[in-house]
Amino acid sequence: MNTVKTVQELRAAVARARSEGKRIALTPTMGNLHSGHAALVAKAAQRADFVVATIFINPLQFGPNEDLATYPRTLAADQEKLLQAGCNLLFTPSVEEMYPHGMADQTLVSVPHLSQGLCGASRPGHFEGVATVVSKLFNMVQPDLAIFGEKDFQQLAVIRAMVRDLNMPIQIIGEPTVRAEDGLALSSRNGYLNEAQRAAAPALYQAIRQTADAISAGEQDFDALLTSKKQQLEAAGFRIDYLEIRDATSLRPTTAENRDVVILAAAFLGKTRLIDNLHLTRS
């Protein structure tokens, strides 16, 4: 696995692979990798001949009071994980390499409806930052396919819409959420949890799972169901950002008649914000 830091080096390496007839896959990350990221890269290696991973902590997608300055930087460990997972090329640009003209006047990519509400409500500008950096990476690499985790369900929906609407010839693949044995979705931010918070954290997915089970059993009153689960989470020590049942494609509010929904949640334990979801399709 080679590691490059400049767009010029990245494009040259990808061009060599493409000249050899190789199918190119891209997996963007912010580093501090865990086994969920490794699963994305391993899936990319199954689907393509040449796997590009990126590690870039993107300032555009962090709000003013978020953890940009403290987000863990673990490059050496990340390189080892990527190598073991089957990565061929790692791109680790600086902020100056990604935004050579500064960020104040940077062209932004906006996916209006899907970026609003849910995480977009509490993290204004976040999805513009995500869509902008991902579109830049897509232009730099021009992959045949790109793989993203379904844990960030709203992000995946935003990227799918961007690719569709801007006619990008890239296949977007969602990979199922990787979980700890107790059900907690793996996240780079789980390391912020103290021992007591880590013990409480699986209750978030349990509430989502119970919501899905109730819907599958025929529950029609979504409002009452969500109110009950919010109270359950608050009793477990969570501060709720949102717990919603939405249409799985549009992410718009939905009703019990909808057979394809997603249950999405974001909640704080202490200062750590956890997100999770469950896609529920009923026949």
Curated annotation (Swiss-Prot):
Protein's name according to its UniProt entry: Pantothenate synthetase
Binding site for (R)-pantoate: Q61, Q155
GO MF annotation list: ATP binding; pantoate-beta-alanine ligase activity
Record-stated family: Belongs to the pantothenate synthetase family.
GO biological process: pantothenate biosynthetic process
Active site positions: H37 (proton donor)
Cited NCBIfam families: panC
Other known facts: The reaction proceeds by a bi uni uni bi ping pong mechanism.
Class in the EC hierarchy, top level: ligase
SUBUNIT field: Homodimer.
Pathway: Cofactor biosynthesis; (R)-pantothenate biosynthesis; (R)-pantothenate from (R)-pantoate and beta-alanine: step 1/1
Pfam (any one): Pantoate_ligase
Keywords in alphabetical order: ATP-binding, Cytoplasm, Ligase, Nucleotide-binding, Pantothenate biosynthesis
PANTHER family associated with the record: CYTIDYLATE KINASE/PANTOATE-BETA-ALANINE LIGASE (PTHR21299), PANTOATE--BETA-ALANINE LIGASE (PTHR21299:SF1)
Function statement: Catalyzes the condensation of pantoate with beta-alanine in an ATP-dependent reaction via a pantoyl-adenylate intermediate.
Any one of the GO CC terms: cytosol
EC number(s) per entry: 6.3.2.1
Residues annotated for beta-alanine binding in this entry: Q61
Disulfide bond positions: none
Reactions that this protein is recorded to catalyse: (R)-pantoate + beta-alanine + ATP = (R)-pantothenate + AMP + diphosphate + H(+)
Binding site for ATP: 30-37, 149-152, 178, 186-189
Predominant subcellular localization, coarse grouping: cytoplasm
Annotated organism of origin: Pseudomonas savastanoi pv. phaseolicola (strain 1448A / Race 6) (Pseudomonas syringae pv. phaseolicola (strain 1448A / Race 6))
Gene name linked to the record: panC
Source taxon at top rank: Bacteria
